[in-house]
């Protein structure tokens, strides 16, 4: 694995010179191998080690290099054709392969090669980009988008129209992470490497980036880039220092533990926030 990483790191340093026509066989094979390992879930761009999320930057670099070394090509789809550098994950799947993998894909859901989809996952008509990791028991609902290299935990519900930001456009240092047992409400956006910690509930229409204030109304504490575990979050506003205008923020209205989350429905948590 170290040899593979070295090839990727060296190629990335000279990425401006690389084209599909001049890519050497060693670099091409290394990038292809990494994409295949990401696709199978054997590798992932970020993982939790000793309680902390660690981003493997060299894997992200391999994803970026894949765009440098590959030409656009014609790809056949069910209703139309595509023209892109990255093949679709399910292009060569047959019924037996889908049964072995153990997830459902509802048309016209699109998943790029290099994204991992775990067992018991349901993909409604949605989009999952290259390098993403979607863990077991997760629902990606209609028109939801899982961005490049984003990490989605077990038993997560991404509601209709949710946007989980990627790392490629614009280029981000770390992927956006949704930990296990989270609920992300319809049309919400979580981007720029924000981490939503385990068991959190994000209401409909909440937008969280690195500069978004995440205000805990119980403690008065303000978080940036991280939603603490077990938070129930709605959209809100905070007054300016002068008090003559207010700016958007996300508000933690309550905290719940796993036991409460298991007993109480999501709708009840969001309806009783006063």
Swiss-Prot record:
GO terms for biological process: diaminopimelate biosynthetic process; lysine biosynthetic process via diaminopimelate. This is 2,3,4,5-tetrahydropyridine-2,6-dicarboxylate N-succinyltransferase. One of its GO terms (molecular function) is nucleotidyltransferase activity. Substrate binds at residues 104, 141. GO terms for cellular component: cytoplasm. Homotrimer. It catalyses: (S)-2,3,4,5-tetrahydrodipicolinate + succinyl-CoA + H2O = (S)-2-succinylamino-6-oxoheptanedioate + CoA. Belongs to the transferase hexapeptide repeat family. Pathway: Amino-acid biosynthesis; L-lysine biosynthesis via DAP pathway; LL-2,6-diaminopimelate from (S)-tetrahydrodipicolinate (succinylase route): step 1/3. PROSITE patterns: HEXAPEP_TRANSFERASES. It comes from the Bacteria. Keywords: Acyltransferase, Amino-acid biosynthesis, Cytoplasm, Diaminopimelate biosynthesis, Lysine biosynthesis, Repeat, Transferase. It holds the Pfam family Hexapep_2. Coiled coil: none annotated. InterPro entries: DapD_Trfase_Hexpep_rpt_fam, Hexapep, Hexapep_transf_CS, THP_succinylTrfase_dom1, THP_succinylTrfase_N_sf, Trimer_LpxA-like_sf. NCBIfam families: dapD, PRK11830.1.
């Amino acid at each position: 694995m170290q040899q593979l990483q070295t090839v990727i790191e060296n190629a990335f340093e000279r990425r401006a010179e690389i084209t599909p026509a001049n890519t050497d066989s060693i670099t091409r094979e290394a990038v292809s191998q990494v994409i295949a390992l990401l696709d199978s879930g054997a590798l992932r761009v970020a993982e939790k080690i000793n309680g902390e999320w660690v981003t493997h930057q060299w894997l992200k670099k391999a994803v970026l290099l894949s765009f440098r070394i590959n030409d656009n090509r014609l790809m056949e789809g069910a209703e139309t054709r595509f023209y892109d550098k990255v093949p679709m994950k399910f292009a060569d799947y047959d019924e037996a392969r889908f049964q072995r993998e153990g997830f459902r894909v509802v048309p016209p859901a699109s998943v790029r090669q290099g994204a991992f989809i775990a067992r018991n996952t349901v993909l409604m008509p949605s989009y999952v980009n290259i390098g993403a990791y979607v863990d077991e028991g997760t629902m990606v609902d209609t028109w939801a988008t899982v961005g490049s290299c984003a990490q989605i935990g077990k038993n997560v519900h991404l509601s209709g129209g949710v946007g989980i930001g990627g790392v490629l456009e614009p280029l981000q240092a770390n992927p956006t992470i949704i930990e296990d047992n989270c609920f992300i409400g319809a049309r919400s956006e979580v981007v720029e490497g924000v981490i939503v910690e385990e068991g959190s509930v994000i209401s409909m229409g909440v937008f969280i980036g690195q500069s978004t204030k995440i205000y805990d109304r119980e403690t008065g504490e303000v978080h940036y880039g991280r939603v603490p575990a077990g938070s129930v979050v709605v959209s809100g506003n905070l007054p300016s220092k002068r008090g003559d205008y207010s700016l958007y923020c996300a508000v933690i209205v309550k905290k719940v533990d796993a036991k409460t989350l298991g007993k109480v429905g999501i709708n009840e948590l969001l309806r009783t926030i006063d």
